[in-house]
């Protein structure tokens, strides 16, 4: 990243954190532009008249909007908005998931931004503590009027780290789902209907029994030893609201103990489904269970179209209800048509979502419970009503609150977790070591964030 442009981000809580963590990528200096300074939060001020309403826009307005997204296909939805604003041209640019975060941040740094960005929750922590993005609680957006129309956890996950600004407006939220081969469960005498299998796998001994039985014939329920721990990770974030590490607990002791059994009994396939050999294993049925978001069914169909009717979906093993991700709109402060851009965001979240989202679960609670969506079936999944399952699961899970420290913490966690399992370390000792390493490695960043949070408190 270039110093000359990254200085312009005008960081709030995370200025010094990133300066330390990125070894000088963010330089200090005078005369730098403070992006979004003109849009400081007014949430502490008395609401102005009409502050609970959104600014009206002339439907005949002639304008252009640009939307940046991290997946393909959104352009097909644009005609819905253009029915309301026929003279508005909307250009959609999609980016590769692997690189979009850096490109979006660089655009915010340069001030060369689109009108709207769509950001995945996995990277949201990078955007939640910087200037250059609008506080959607402020006029003319007044998004606070919708707070009760979202789950409390999802709303909190879209707030800034100090909980004073609403940085994102969520479009959808996805649980993590178990995908499994029904025919293989039938063949080996295990429960094969979605509810029955989900209930059976709630007991870890039952899941391990399945894994041991199927492994004898070269069939696997997990790709690698620590994969099962990922399902537990989807239920609890690294840090609490006080930035204290919160994964050194009984839940993760159980997760690691299961992963250690998988390692000791060689129950993992040691294949990655995102490789050619992994895809082949999916096609052959060597991998009979996977854990993905609600998009997983389409992905399996792409890998193994000939397996139509053989796959089903159910809840996670071990009685877990985990969150995969959410898609969140953010509004760059340097956008040229911010009021219209907010109308665009508001429309897709609170109106268009009521008509169904191609199997995704709307973040907006009034858009859920659509009878047509609930009754829809997926032919590839043996005509299973998978959307109804997705809504059931999303209502039982809780979204997690991201922090700017999560990526660094995850790198330490993943490495030490894999090493600890491989070396057969005592579980409690392993977790103590991971906590100590994360807390000590990120001590400077944690201290800076805590001090800034204290200073921002009323």
PLM features per residue range, with description:
Residues 1-63, 444-458:
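Short, low-complexity disordered leader/linker segments with a strong preference
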Residues 39-43, 394-458:
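Conserved C-terminal helix/tail region of periplasmic/extracytoplasmic solute-binding proteins
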Residues 46-53, 121-177, 205, 310-314:
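Hinge/lid segment of periplasmic solute-binding proteins
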Residues 56-72, 88-93, 116, 167:
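Short, well-ordered beta-strand elements
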Residues 83, 160-227, 242-270, 333, ...:
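Helix-loop-helix "hinge/cap" segment bordering the ligand-binding cleft or interdomain interface
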Residues 83-150, 188, 288-289, 367:
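Extracytoplasmic "Venus flytrap"/periplasmic binding protein-like
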Residues 98-101, 219-227, 235-316, 339, ...:
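Extracytoplasmic ligand-binding clamshell segments of periplasmic binding protein
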Residues 327-407, 418, 429:
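Mature extracytoplasmic/periplasmic domains
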């Amino acid at each position: 990243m270039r110093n000359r442009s990254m200085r312009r981000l005008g960081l709030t809580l995370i200025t010094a954190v990133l300066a330390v963590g990125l070894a000088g990528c963010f330089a200090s200096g005078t005369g730098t532009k403070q992006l979004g300074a003109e849009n400081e939060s007014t949430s502490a001020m008395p609401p102005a008249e009409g502050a609970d309403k959104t600014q009206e826009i002339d439907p005949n307005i002639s304008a252009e909007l640009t939307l940046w997204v991290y997946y393909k296909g959104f352009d097909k939805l644009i005609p819905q908005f253009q029915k309301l604003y026929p003279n508005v041209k909307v250009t959609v640019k999609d980016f590769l998931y692997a690189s979009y975060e850096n490109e979006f941040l660089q655009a915010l740094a340069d001030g060369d931004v689109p009108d709207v960005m769509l950001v995945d929750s996995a990277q949201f922590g990078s955007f939640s503590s910087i200037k250059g993005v609008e506080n959607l609680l402020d006029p003319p957006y007044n998004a606070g009027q919708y707070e009760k129309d979202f789950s409390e956890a999802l709303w909190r996950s879209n707030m800034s780290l100090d909980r004073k600004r609403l940085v994102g407006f969520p479009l959808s939220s996805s649980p993590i789902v178990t995908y499994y081969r029904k025919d293989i469960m039938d063949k080996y005498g295990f429960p094969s209907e979605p509810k029955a299998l989900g209930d059976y796998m709630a007991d870890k001994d039952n899941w391990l029994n399945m894994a041991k039985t199927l492994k004898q014939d070269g069939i696997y329920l997990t790709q690698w030893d620590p994969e099962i721990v990922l399902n537990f990770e989807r239920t609890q974030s690294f840090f609490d609201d006080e930035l204290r590490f919160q994964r050194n607990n009984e839940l993760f002791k159980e997760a690691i103990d299961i992963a250690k059994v998988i390692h000791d009994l060689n129950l993992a396939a040691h294949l990655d489904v995102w490789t050619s050999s992994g895809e082949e294993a999916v096609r052959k049925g060597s991998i009979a269970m996977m854990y993905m978001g609600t998009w997983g069914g389409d992905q399996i169909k792409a890998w193994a179209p000939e397996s139509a009717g053989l796959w089903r979906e159910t809840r996670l093993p071990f009685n877990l209800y985990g969150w995969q991700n959410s898609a969140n709109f953010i509004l760059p402060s340097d956008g040229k048509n911010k009021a219209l851009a907010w109308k665009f965001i508001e429309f897709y979240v609170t109106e268009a979502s009521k008509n169904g989202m191609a199997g995704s679960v709307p973040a907006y609670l009034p858009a859920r419970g659509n009878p047509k969506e609930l009754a829809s079936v997926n032919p590839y999944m043996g005509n299973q009503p998978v959307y109804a399952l997705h809504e059931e699961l999303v209502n039982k899970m809780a979204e997690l609150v991201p922090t700017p420290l999560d990526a660094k913490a995850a790198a330490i966690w993943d490495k030490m977790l894999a090493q600890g399992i491989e070396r057969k370390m005592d579980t409690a000792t392993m977790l103590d070591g991971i906590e100590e390493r994360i807390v000590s490695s990120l001590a400077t960043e944690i201290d800076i964030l805590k001090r800034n949070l204290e200073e921002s408190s009323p």
